[in-house]
Curated annotation (Swiss-Prot):
Cofactor(s) named in the record: Zn(2+)
Protein family: In the central section; belongs to the AAA ATPase family. In the C-terminal section; belongs to the peptidase M41 family.
GO biological process: protein catabolic process; proteolysis
Keywords (A to Z) from UniProt: ATP-binding, Cell inner membrane, Cell membrane, Hydrolase, Membrane, Metal-binding, Metalloprotease, Nucleotide-binding, Protease, Transmembrane, Transmembrane helix, Zinc
Ligand binding (ATP): G214, P215, P216, G217, T218, G219, K220, T221
Pfam family, one: FtsH_ext
InterPro entries listed in its UniProt record: AAA+_ATPase, AAA_lid_3, ATPase_AAA_core, ATPase_AAA_CS, FtsH, P-loop_NTPase, Pept_M41_FtsH_extracell, Peptidase_M41
PROSITE patterns listed in its UniProt record: AAA
Protein name per the record: ATP-dependent zinc metalloprotease FtsH
Membrane topology designation: Multi-pass membrane protein
Annotated catalytic residues: E436
Record's subcellular location: Cell inner membrane
Taxonomy of the source species: Bacteria, Pseudomonadati, Thermodesulfobacteriota, Desulfuromonadia, Desulfuromonadales
Organism: Pelobacter propionicus (strain DSM 2379 / NBRC 103807 / OttBd1)
Length: 623
């Protein structure tokens, strides 16, 4: 409820309570009154030590003629103290001799009525009703101030972060490195918000909704904030998950509240992050067509389609799952413009690194181009984490500035996982060394594979050893020969274990998952099997709550399923056989590489080349 109504009432009640407690405290401190028994009262009266007395029903108060010592409890201990007054209680049996004796000893006697005053009685009966009516009145005023949402007013508020036109945003297009094509498309939105009359003069219309699509960490939210900073208009930011609540109808109410505020502040931008939280296709998943999420989506569709041209409100939204969005969201008039934000290439990665290294102290001899070329596939968020990890490493070593070595170590930590120093037996170490040597040797000898960046038998992350390959450039197409070589490299560790020890271990579990998944994609999605042909099949790709259907639908026969399984197994078997032939022909190099790993634990690409020797003398059987 509105605090401005509660504060005066709370202050009055608090003042009355403090005033009452203060009166009680000072009354008890100022009055020297002793609580005595009726027998003590008669004894003091017999000694003519009572000056005056007041009777009110069975309650008796009075004064002694002089200071009288009476036992009293002080901090839990009984002590003798002097009092000038007393109080007592008369017995229920009427004592006919008390009053005559008081009169005979010339004690001043007063009598008070036991009836409650009429005004006090009225106050006792009326006060609770007055308080209840006041609480009801304050509540109604508060709910009316929240609009038509009634008792659910607190839930119906959108909770969006609002930045008004006068507020200065900390991000602009200058702070967003790379993504030139994406920024160019969004600059049209900024130009419209800055000068809508120019667009209206020539009859152009700006898209009502712009959907930012891209993998996680590529900078979709950052780009939306930059649009707000460049446009200089009101900006409302909210995550789509904030619309959903346990109460039915709250999500739709929050959507209405968000767009009502945006229309009042027009021209404005509404940014909805993770749109797929409410924008998934209706009817997908369990729960039927009347759940809270679908009501929220329906309200969002209605709000976006109900804009008038003079309502200069543009909706930006971000998602990494455009495939699961409802088609009604993507039609012209709603999110009719899609801005695709891909992972940056090495030039954009260098620009992103230049932005992030502004915040740290750097050694002048750092070559960011080398780091950018050595981090293919990394997003802007990954590069920011890399720079931060380098700064942490430099701080841990008490270095004056971040050096190239710190950046390389940070890159390895992100690519290979955090290093774990754990004690393992010599036999376990030997098995790991041969396993990683098998991967490394196969990758080094096969033509067309990615170069070896680093191989180590020091545990990183969840792995006991890591063989890290880095492509020389960003890849957008994967030839079949390249993918088949990846299968061979992945099987190299398992084959090396069998050659060295006569059996395999559980260490190849991750490799087997990798080759099975890759072979399945080659057969079912990329049409690389001659027996299956150029058809695609959905095999474990979609989940009920993420996709367009309630459950995974099988669109092929049992005979085709058997053929797919046979082709997947054939790809893996051929890869294992090729790895076996290659390692058997180069057994001496395998042993040298495994021994070097046991001695040095970590080898970089140049050291691997030095151990293996020239490729001209290496024996690589044809595939």
């Amino acid at each position: 409820m509105n605090q401005s109504f509660w504060r005066p009432l709370f202050a009055i009640l608090l003042f009355m309570l403090v005033f009452h407690l203060t009166n009680i405290f000072f009354a008890q401190q100022g009055a020297q009154v002793a609580q005595i028994s009726y027998s003590r009262l008669r004894a003091e009266l017999a000694q003519d030590n009572i000056k005056k007395i007041t009777l009110k029903g069975t309650a008796v108060t009075g004064e002694f003629r002089g200071k009288t010592r009476v036992s009293a409890l002080v901090q839990g201990k009984e002590q003798q103290r002097e009092f000038t007054g007393f109080s007592s209680v008369l017995p229920t049996i009427d004592d006919q001799t008390l009053v005559p004796e008081l009169m005979a000893r010339k004690v001043e006697v007063s009598a008070l009525s036991t009836e409650t005053p009429l005004l006090l009685n009225a106050l006792i009966y009326v006060a609770p009703w007055v308080i209840l009516i006041a609480i009801w009145w304050v509540g109604m005023r508060s709910m009316r101030s929240q609009g038509p949402s009634g008792m659910m007013g607190g839930f119906s508020r959108s909770g969006a972060k609002a930045y008004l036109a006068g507020d200065k945003m900390a991000v602009s297009f200058k702070d967003v490195a790379g993504m030139e094509d994406s920024k160019q498309e969004l600059k049209e939105v900024v130009d419209y918000l800055r000068n809508p009359k120019q667009f209206a003069r020539i009859g152009g219309k700006v898209p009502k909704g712009v959907l930012l699509v891209g993998p996680p960490g590529t900078g979709k939210t950052l780009l939306a904030r930059a649009v707000a900073g460049e446009a200089g208009v009101a900006f409302f930011s909210i995550s789509a998950s904030q619309f959903i609540e346990m109460f039915v109808g709250v999500g739709a109410s929050r959507v209405r509240d968000l767009f009502t505020n945006a229309k009042k502040a027009a021209p404005s931008i509404v940014f909805i992050d993770e749109l797929d939280a409410v924008g998934r296709s209706r009817g997908a998943g369990f729960g039927g067509g009347h759940d809270e999420r679908e009501q929220t989506l329906n309200q969002l569709l209605s709000e976006m389609d109900g804009f008038d041209q003079h309502e200069e409100v543009i909706v930006l939204a971000a998602t990494n799952r455009p495939d699961v969005l409802d088609p009604a969201l993507l039609r012209p008039g709603r999110f009719d413009r899609h801005v695709v934000i891909e992972r940056p290439d090495w030039r954009d990665r260098e620009k992103i690194l230049q932005v992030h290294v502004r915040k740290i102290t750097m050694n002048g001899r750092i070559d960011l181009g080398v780091i950018a070329r050595g981090t293919p596939g990394m997003t802007g968020a990954d590069l920011e984490s890399l720079v931060n990890e380098a700064a942490i490493l430099a701080s841990r070593e008490n270095a004056a500035a971040v050096t190239m070595e710190h950046l390389e170590k940070a890159k390895d930590k992100i690519l290979m996982g955090s290093e774990r120093r754990m004690i393992i037996s010599l036999e376990e170490k030997r098995i790991t060394a041969y396993h990683e040597a098998g991967h490394t040797l196969v990758a080094r000898l096969l033509p067309g594979t990615d170069p070896i960046h680093k191989v180590t038998i020091i545990p990183h992350g969840m792995a006991l050893g890591v063989t890290q390959q880095l492509p020389e450039d960003d890849r957008y197409h994967y030839p079949q020969s390249y993918l088949e070589n990846r299968l061979v490299v992945a099987m190299g560790g398992r084959v090396a274990e069998r050659l060295a020890f006569g059996e395999v271990s559980s260490g190849a579990q991750g490799d087997l998952k990798q080759v099975t998944s890759l072979a399945e994609k080659m057969v079912c999605q990329w049409g690389m099997s001659e027996k299956v042909g150029g058809m695609t099949f959905s095999r474990g790709e979609e989940h009920p709550f993420l996709g367009m259907k309630l459950a995974e639908e099988k669109t092929f026969s049992e005979a085709m399923a058997w053929r797919i399984d046979q082709e997947i197994a054939a790809f893996i078997t051929r890869a294992e056989q090729r790895a076996g032939d290659l390692l058997s022909a180069n057994r001496e190099r395998l042993d040298l590489l495994a021994q070097a790993l046991q001695d040095e634990e970590t080898l970089d690409g140049s050291r691997v080349d030095e151990i293996i020797g020239s490729l001209n003398t290496a024996q690589a059987p044809p595939p």
